[in-house]
Amino acid sequence: AAGVYSDHECSDMDDAMAKLRNGQFIMIRDGTAAHNLEALVDLLRQPYYDRCMFCTDDKHPSDLLEKGHIDYLIRKAIHYGIDPIVAVKTACHNPARYFALNNRGAIAPGYLADFAIIDNFDDFNVEMVFRKGVLTCSNGAVHDFEAPRIEDYLVERAHDTFHVAHLTAEDFHDARPRGVIGLVPG
């Protein structure tokens, strides 16, 4: 079946509830330009939170450095009184389920065992990172790790993909009129 399965543009509960009733997932957006978490925080309670996930949509690099990324939304949701487990599930499990990443988003048999250990739910500082169950980062230091192997067919698809005739400076000449914006009396 074709259709729109999610929305990241909701800015109020009425809009979000209408989309939930139509079967959509709600991506609760809180980035640099749009801040919708506070208005939509009640979605992170039963019976709705299983159909919600966090997204940033846009995030200025300085905001990433100062505030964080999805971890910032988790901390902010907890600040608004959301159960920390629900906040983490909204950041990890729900998006993995939505995007059909069936071996990610949880710590369980058959999953990849990609996870982070944090100090506490207030500060959310990462103390350790595990990838496929192997410690890859601790105490702020990245451990040696084997570079992932990229399948040959993916390498082939990424190379020799842009084919264009030889270009000259004349090819970039633009003869369209300039300064076309003006005032119309009236």
What is each PLM-predicted segment?
Residues 4-104, 116-124:
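Active-site-adjacent C-terminal substructures of enzyme catalytic domains
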